[in-house]
């Protein structure tokens, strides 16, 4: 069987199982099995493959049809300008979160030797993207998950910035190391009661601990704000990702802790997404 027929068979199976990006996913899964680029597959569709390759491909297609995200199946996710290693231990990087990178780069355009803290570092996509762009910035990432930190370290090595970043296993309440010019965080912000309404791919496979924002959706955001007020230098900046309906509540929490809200930015779907504030 040649590549074209394999892709068609995989696509048809995925379509029957309501996978919207069926053809693209088939190409990506075949790329993973063959260890070649998607472009290579598209340009060589008449190439025949062995039964062993076809069998491996089918197994991945079945997993994808069950809802398992493509990023977990191929072990990588594109974010900002880079490809990040991911497993089921970390949340898959979202395009909406790139807004944080964009705004941080605007904020720090003329800054140097900034110390950055990422609370809940996960795969490292936020912190490491910033450090990759800003060659004289130094970063610290904390997470309660040992596996997440291992993945962040792998991504730091891949990007060649391990010498400018440190990682610590800690929850935010117990972290006391240093003072920072900039703190970033994409904390869990979905109400516990709303988790069941998430897409099948998300609720079935992604880590609940990275999604669950507690009864009111802001329990983790509250912790980040409280601790940031202690860990941040005067006039330091806090950049948070929030849910579309949390603007008012988060502003209240920030004001109580002595932060001035500079601006709230909308994402590409015109939802409130990123809040920037200054510690007074």
PLM ranges: what are they?
Residues 1-57:
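A short N-terminal interaction module
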Residues 29, 67, 97, 126, ...:
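Residue-level signal for inorganic ion chemistry
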Residues 32-107:
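Conserved AdoMet
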Residues 93, 118, 141, 213, ...:
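Conserved SAM-binding loop
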Residues 161, 206, 232-234:
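Helix-to-beta-strand junctions that scaffold the AdoMet/dcAdoMet cofactor pocket
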Residues 189-220:
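Mobile active-site "lid"/loop adjacent to the S-adenosyl-L-methionine
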């Amino acid at each position: 069987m040649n590549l074209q027929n394999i892709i068609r068979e995989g696509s048809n199976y995925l379509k029957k199982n309501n996978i919207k990006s069926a053809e693209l996913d088939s190409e990506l899964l075949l790329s993973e099995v063959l260890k070649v680029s998607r472009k290579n597959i598209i340009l060589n569709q008449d190439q025949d493959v062995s039964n062993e390759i076809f069998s491996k491909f089918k197994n991945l297609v079945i997993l994808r049809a069950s809802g398992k995200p493509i990023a977990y199946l191929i072990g990588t996710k594109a974010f900002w300008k880079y490809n990040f290693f991911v497993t089921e231990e970390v949340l898959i990087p979202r395009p909406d979160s790139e807004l944080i990178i964009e705004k941080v780069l605007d904020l720090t355009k003329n800054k140097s030797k900034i110390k950055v803290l990422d609370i809940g570092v996960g795969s490292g996509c936020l912190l490491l993207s910033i450090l990759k762009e800003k060659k004289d910035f130094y970063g610290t990432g904390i997470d309660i998950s040992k596996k997440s930190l291992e993945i962040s370290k792998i991504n730091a090595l891949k990007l060649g910035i391990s010498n400018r970043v440190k990682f610590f296993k800690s929850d935010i309440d117990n972290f006391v190391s240093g003072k920072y010019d900039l703190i970033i965080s994409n904390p869990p912000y979905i109400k516990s009661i709303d988790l069941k309404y998430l897409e099948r791919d998300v609720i079935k496979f992604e880590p609940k601990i990275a999604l669950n924002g507690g009864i009111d959706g802001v329990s983790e955001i509250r912790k980040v704000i409280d601790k940031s007020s202690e860990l941040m230098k005067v006039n330091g900046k806090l950049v948070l990702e929030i849910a579309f309906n949390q603007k008012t509540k988060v502003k209240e929490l920030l004001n109580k802790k002595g932060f001035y809200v500079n601006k709230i930015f909308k994402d590409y779907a015109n939802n409130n997404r990123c809040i920037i504030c200054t510690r007074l």
